[in-house]
Amino acid sequence: INPYLAFETLGALSDLPAEKVRANYIKAVGKGMLKVMSKMGISTFQSYCGAQIFDGIGLSSSLVERYFTGTATMIEGVDLDEIAAETTERHQRAYANENARLDTGGAYAWRAEGEAHAWSPNTVANLQHAVRGNLPDKYRAFAAGVNDQSRRLLTIRGLFEFKPAGVAIPLEEVEPASEIVKRFTTGAMSFGSISREAHTTLAIAMNRMGGKSNTGEGGEERDRFKPLPNGDSMRSAIKQVASGRFGVTTEYLVNADEVQIKIAQGAKPGEGGQLPGHKVDRHIASVRHSTPGVGLISPPPHHDIYSIEDLAQLVFDLKNVNETARVSVKLVSEVGVGTVAAGVVKARADHVTISGYEGGTGASPLTSLTHAGSPWEIGLAETQQTLVLNRLRGRVAVQADGGLRTGRDVAVAAMLGADEFGFATAPLIAAGCIMMRKCHLNTCPVGIATQDPVLRARFTGAPEHVINYFFFIAEELREIMASIGIRRVEEMIGRTDLLDTRTVVEHWKARGIDLSRLLYAPRTAQGVARFNSERQDHGLANVFDRDLIAAAEPALNRGTPVHIERDVRNVHRSVGTMLSGQVARRFGHEGLPQDSIFVRLKGTAGQSFGAFLAHGVTLELSGDGNDYVGKGLSGGRVIVRQPESANRDPAQNIVVGNTVLYGAIAGEAYFEGVAGERFAVRNSGAVAVVEGAGDHCCEYMTGGVVCVLGPVGRNFAAGMSGGIAYVLDEDGTFESRCNMAMVSLEPVVEEEMLSEREYGHGGDLETSGLVEIMSNLGSGDADRLKALIA
C-alpha cells in the first residue's frame, strides 16, 4: 500500500524533512494496526490481511455480497445509490463557490450545533433536577428528550414502536416498581476509576432497592463488607473478576451475591482495563495489591481462558469459593455472540451480560469509542434466538448493558430477550456527573472520576438521587406495560412480536432499513423457556473438598490444627478452593494461623489445584499438578514435589502446568520441578520458588518474589511493574529472553552461598547451581527469601 496522498499532505503541512514525516506517519499507522491486531487476537500480518474483522451494520445485502463478501450483517440498510448520492453531496460541499462554515464537530464532547449526543446539557440538567427534587415532571421531560429518536435516529431501538399484547390495563394491575428495580444493576466501574464517595453511593442505593451494584475490576475495600450502623451496606453485590485479577482475594469473592467474569467491555472490546498511574494513590494500590503511581493495565485476555472448557473451569472455581453466588459472564455485542453465549451456558454460567458499544465511555480510547463495538440490540437479539433454539434459555439470566437510559429502553431490551438491565453513565449523572469527559485525567470537577481529595470533597451525590432515578425508570416502564396490556416483566421477555418498526423514517438514507432479523422469533415446541426459569447444576454435591471440610472442622470451629492425608486424581479439580471459601467466610483475609489445616496429598491433581487458597491452609502434593495451580492464591501455601519413588532430575521434569499463580495475592508456593508457560502471571504478592519455567514468566507482575532456579523461556517480565524476580542464569543468555520494556537487570551486589539442604518441606529444590541474593533489598526481602528457601 502506498498512501501517496497522505505523504504529500503531511509533507506540505510540516516543516520537518519529508523522510522524517514519512517515517513518523508509518510508525503511527503501524502502531495503530498492531493495536487492532492485538484487540482481535491476530498474531501475524498474513492473518490480518483479508480477515474482515468487522460487522456490516445498515448495509444492504446486495452491497455486502458484492463488495464485502462474507461479512456478517444483521440490519439491512443503504445500497450503492445512497452511498453515491452522499459522496456527491460531500464533493459539492467541498468545492462549492461560496465559503462554507466548517462543521462544529463534537464527536467526543458535546458542542452546540455539533454532532448529536444522547447526553446533552439539557438532558443532564433535566435528569439531575428530577432526581434531586424527586420531580416526576422533570423526569418525563428528560425521558421525552432521550426517547425522541424519530427525529435524531441515534439508536436502533428508536426505530421500534410498541404493539399491544391486548387491551390496556389499569396501572394498579402492573408489577410494582419495588419489584422491577430488583432487575436493575449498575455498571462495572472500578474503585480507582471513580472515587470512593461515588462508588459507595451507588452501592448503598442499589442495596436499599434490592438491586445490585458492581465493583468493576479494581477490588473493594474490606471495611465495606460489614453493614453500617444505620443498616445501610456499602458492599457491592457483584464482584467482578477481570483479566488483571486486581484485588481478587478469597475474602472478596465470598462477599458476593454474584461474581462476574469480564471477558470484554462493550466500549472497548479486545482491550484490558487501564488505570493511569496518577490515579493509583496509596489507597488504590493497597486495594489492588500494586505499586502507587504506576499505571495498571489488565491483559487483553484472561490467561486461564483459551476455550469454553477453560471458562467452565473458572466458573467451577468461583462456584467452589462461593457456592451461593451466581456466576456471570460479560460478553460484547457482535454478530456471532449468540454462539459464544450458548457455550457460556453450557459452561454452567448462571448469568450472561451482553454489553453494547454506547456505554462505558468515560476513559475509553477515542478510536475504540468511534470504531469498536456494536449496539446491544444486535447481540441481545442473536443471543436470545440462539439460546431459545438450543433450549438453553431457561438455564441463564440475560442482561442488556450499555447506554440504557429510560423505561422505554428497558421495555425494548426486555422484548428482545433481557431478564435484567445494566446502567452506568446514567446513575453517575444522577449522582452528579456532568459529562466533562475528563475521567482519565483525574481532574473530574464534581468529585466522581478522581482520587484527588480536594476534588472528591466537591461530590454532592446521595443514594437517594440514584434511587429516585431507578424508580422513575420503573414507573415509566409500568406505564408502557399498562398501555400494551402486560402485567409482569417476565411476560414481555423475548416478545419480539410486540415490537414493530416505524413505517415512516424521516431520513432519506434510512428508507432501506430492515430490522426483521432482530425481530425473528424461533419456532420451538411448547414449553421451551423464553426467560430464566431454572438453576444451573454446578456439580458441587460431591466435590473433593467436602471431605476436606469435614476433616478440617476442628480447625474451622475451634482453631485446633489438623493434619489430613488423602490420595488425589486428575478428576479432582479445584482442590482446596471450597475449603478456603469456608476459611475466608469465617475468618476473613487473615485466615487461620499458618499450617492450621495441613493437607498432604499423593497423585496427580486436576485443574486449579490450590486455587484461591486461604491463609492457614497448606497443600502438599507428592506428584504433579495440571494448569492453574495456585490461581488467586490468598495467603495459603502450595508445595508440589516429586514422588519419593521418582528417579528423575526435577530440573528436567515439568511438575505443574501453565498459568500457575495467576493473580496470586499472598502466600507461598514451592515447586520441585519445572513449570509451564506464564508462571506467576499477574502475581501481586506471593513468594514462589520453581526450578524452571516456560515463556512469559512473571508477565504483568505487580508484587511478590519469584525465584527461578533454572532456565526460563522468552518474554520474561513483560509488563512487569512491581515485585522482584531472581533467575539462575547459568549460561549467561537470560537477558536475551527478558522483555526489558519495564524492568532492569542487576547483578548480585553481594553474594551469599546457600548450601543445598532441605528447607523443611521435603527435599532439595536446587541441584545445579547457587542462588544469589541481592543484599540491598528493602523491607527485609533478602532475609525473607533466604529463610523461605533455606
Where are the language model's segments positioned?
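Flexible, glycine-rich loop/tail regions that form catalytic "lids" or insertion modules at the edges
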Residues: 3-7, 18-247, 256-269, 278, ...
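Long, charged, glycine-rich C-terminal linkers/tails
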Residues: 218-220, 332, 596-599
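Generic recognition of stable, solvent-exposed alpha-helical segments in well-folded globular domains
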Residues: 20-32, 40-43, 59-63, 78, ...
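Short, flexible, solvent-exposed loop/turn segments with mixed acidic/basic and small polar residues
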Residues: 177-180, 317-319, 554-556, 714
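Long, distal/terminal scaffolding or interaction modules
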Residues: 455, 467, 480-484, 493-496, ...
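Alpha/beta enzyme core
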Residues: 2-13, 34, 45-70, 204, ...
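Gly/Ser/Thr/Ala-enriched C-terminal appendages of enzymes
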Residues: 2-65, 69-105, 415-418, 422-505, ...
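Hydrophobic alpha-helical scaffolding
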Residues: 15-27, 35-43, 113, 117, ...
